[in-house]
Amino acid sequence: MSRGFVREGDQEEVPLVPQRAYLPAGVPNFVTREGLEQLLKEKEELISERENLGVTNENEKRIEQNYLNAKLHLLNDRIAEARVVEITVQPPEEITFGATVTLKTGLSGNMQTLRIVGVDEADIAQGKISFISPLAKMLINKKVGDKVTLKRDRQDIVFEIIGIECK
């Protein structure tokens, strides 16, 4: 787009806003109750940040407001599409969205606990994996004692399901 006939002050850059966690088109945005609360809290924080900008330069303030407005727009879209899945109504004997799963890893026998959550909630450091992740997709509808094999590069990793908790 040509920018030849604009005022000098109007030549600010459009803010680049990082996209939210990937959610394929047409896939419902399932979230846990905690996940929705987390999204709403993030919205409150962004609104507060936008209202309390410490920038005195008008041009910088407008750029920062545009950036925060763009982030809010993406967040509002995600909240509007959110579908809360009540974990307490899930069958306790099989893995479903929101379940916490204890796995034993193949030959090493290492134990690992993971919870299957929404894309915006996923954080492997906290043991939370997205329901669209390859491992979560393999675990859904499995039961205690079942095994799943995750194919990685040159190695297959076998996970045995040791426990399932829905709370």
Segments predicted by a language model, with ranges:
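Residues that recognize and position ribonucleotide moieties
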Residues: N29, E94, I157
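Non-DNA-binding regulatory cores of transcription-related proteins
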Residues: V89-K151
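Helix-rich terminal scaffold detector
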Residues: M1-R78
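Short, compositionally biased
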Residues: V119, I161-K167
